[in-house]
Regions:
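Membrane-proximal helix-turn-helix segments that form the acceptor-binding/catalytic region
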Residues: 42-45, 71-75, 88, 98-117, ...
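Donor nucleotide-sugar binding/catalytic pocket of nucleotide-sugar-dependent glycosyltransferases
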Residues: 108-148
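Nucleotide-activated donor-binding/catalytic signature segment of Leloir-type glycosyltransferases, i.e.
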Residues: 198-218
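Acidic donor-binding loop of glycosyltransferase active sites
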Residues: 225-239
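Conserved acidic donor-binding segment of nucleotide-sugar-dependent glycosyltransferases
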Residues: 269-277, 284-291
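A charged, aromatic-enriched C-terminal amphipathic alpha-helix characteristic of glycosyltransferases
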Residues: 291-323
Length: 324
């Protein structure tokens, strides 16, 4: 049996789930502060020396981890798969910004020297091909959640907005859209650390918006099951949103941004242009047809689970071909 190892420098559900599926020995190396990189490099080298993998999976980010794995591959002679989560600034032309140019250099290096670069969508796969890499599309596994209790929510209809208050999230437009609804009619619950949101923007939220703050895992899962629909938005063009997979898992009608990569995968969602009028209209649309959208998402869940298993089998075959 071949020895499989998965190393990541940050905790993400995707790496945990995929490492389990691929039968890998799993290592999380997480450090903060100025010594983060030298300590992480040392621990990674120690793991590689101890485990002597035949097949190594690494998560990118971290770019440094992926680059290190590419270098060590030629010494330790393992097959390398890099699970790449973002474009890492390769989709834009940045000039005269030294740290960006350095990261772009590492990005190209890791794409060309990895045996397989795993990506979540066709847009990223095309980018990897253009840079002479070997891509394979494998979205996230639809997670399995267990509800432990129903959360009492205050609206007649309740929407959960899955948020991290990132710069790619049109939170202000959502707050404006919610002014079209009364508190009795529709209530919006927004997850995530709201301290990241500008206080001036937060103060404009109407009374039918509740900021939950960061929720622990089980409380978050219970919220997924307790709401009527889930909203997950981004302005980014190549981002597959974790909250979309979670909405499908909980069989909840989904409102998400009108991006090609999201349309391609989450076919039965309601897609929105990230404007306040568009968001308001999408909420009305989904709540006026809630049973229909619930059935469509339930059907989509079964389809995506079957589709993912087929993609997984194809990747195992690709891995076998590389190995031979």
């Amino acid at each position: 049996l071949q020895k499989r190892v998965w190393i990541t420098w940050e905790t993400q559900r995707r790496s945990i789930e995929l490492s389990r599926k691929f039968g890998c020995e799993f290592f999380i190396i997480e450090h903060k502060g100025v010594m983060r990189y030298p300590i992480s490099v040392f621990e990674t080298l120690s793991i590689l020396k101890k485990t002597k993998p035949d097949i190594l999976f690494v998560q990118n980010p971290s770019m440094i981890l992926a680059a290190l794995a590419c270098i060590c591959k030629y010494i330790l002679k393992y097959i390398l798969l890099v699970d790449r989560h973002t474009t890492f600034l390769l989709d834009k032309d940045y000039k005269n910004i030294p740290w960006v140019l350095f990261f772009q250099f590492l990005s190209r290096l890791t794409i060309r020297h990895a045996d397989i670069t795993i990506v979540t969508n066709s847009l990223l796969a095309d980018m990897v091909k253009r840079l002479k890499g070997n891509p394979f599309i494998l979205p996230d596994i639809i997670p399995t959640f267990v509800e432990t209790e129903r959360v009492e929510l205050k609206g007649r209809r309740n929407i959960l907005m899955v948020s991290s208050f990132g710069i790619d999230e049109p939170v202000q437009e959502v707050l404006i859209a919610m002014k079209d609804f009364s508190q009795d009619e529709v209530c919006l619950y927004v997850t995530g650390n709201y301290n990241k949101l500008d206080e001036r923007v937060r103060s404009t939220a109407p009374s039918n918006v509740v900021f939950t703050g960061f929720l622990d895992e089980q409380d978050y899962i219970n919220m997924l099951f307790s709401c009527d629909a889930i909203m997950v938005l981004t302005t980014a063009s190549a981002c597959m949103l974790c909250g979309c997979y979670e909405a499908v898992s909980a069989r909840k009608p989904l409102i998400t941004s009108d991006k090609d990569v999201l349309r391609e995968y989450f076919t039965d969602a309601v897609f929105v242009d990230n404007t306040a009028p568009g968001i308001s209209a999408s909420i009305k649309k989904i709540l006026d047809n809630i049973d229909n959208y619930r059935e469509r998402i339930e059907s989509l869940k079964g389809k995506l689970i079957t589709q993912w298993e087929e993609q997984y089998k194809q990747l195992e075959k690709r891995l076998s071909d590389v190995n031979s």
